[in-house]
């Protein structure tokens, strides 16, 4: 496998392998592919990379991922190019790669913000949480998540470092415009995860109010770890009870070392 900095990312290489498997076997439209776990073993890669490759193939219309039912072939013509889901380099990363970058960036932003935040900054964070609560209470499917974005942005702005704010804005924009993230996010039930993540946000805010930099860093890290695990759970196509432990993560004690 090539490195993530080569012309192709790992999930793109694996996507091409799965496409070749569909063509050469061959699997006809409507037929079910082997389970994600078997594909990972067959190609000697992690299930996370296979999962991202399947999302890419789903975007391109080659397969359909049915949660709890399996992976089904839609097109076996081989006419689709799997090099990239989008020509824009900002959209070229897989969703879990984006999450890992956010985890590294935003945990350190939260740590610094705990030392820099003013009273006005805390007020902005509280207002963002209130907006989140109103959006959650509306219970409308696909309702706005602007409160979520405003909360994370308020933390970045509390560093009073314009470069950190810009880095945050860019990472969020990449997420919003990333077709693989959008595809994965579409499999989620908003009401289930947004309530959990609102609770995470309250823990982060509590640490920031106390100016506890270590607690703020760890709370943000754990929040994005929870996001990652929820996405892994909901993106699994073999077992609806999969708990997401196959994605490598750093323990909290390593983060704070």
Curated annotation (Swiss-Prot):
One Gene Ontology term from the biological process aspect of the record: DNA-templated transcription
UniProt protein name: Uxu operon transcriptional regulator
InterPro entries the UniProt entry points to: GntR_C (IPR011711), TF_FadR/GntR_C (IPR008920), Tscrpt_reg_HTH_GntR (IPR000524), WH-like_DNA-bd_sf (IPR036388), WH_DNA-bd_sf (IPR036390)
UniProt entry keywords in alphabetical sequence: DNA-binding, Repressor, Transcription, Transcription regulation
SUPFAM superfamilies: GntR ligand-binding domain-like (SSF48008), Winged helix' DNA-binding domain (SSF46785)
Signal peptide annotation: none
A Gene Ontology molecular function term of the record: DNA binding
PROSITE patterns recorded: HTH_GNTR
Binding region for DNA: 36-55
KW Repressor (keyword) present: yes
The HTH gntR-type domain, residue ranges: 8-76
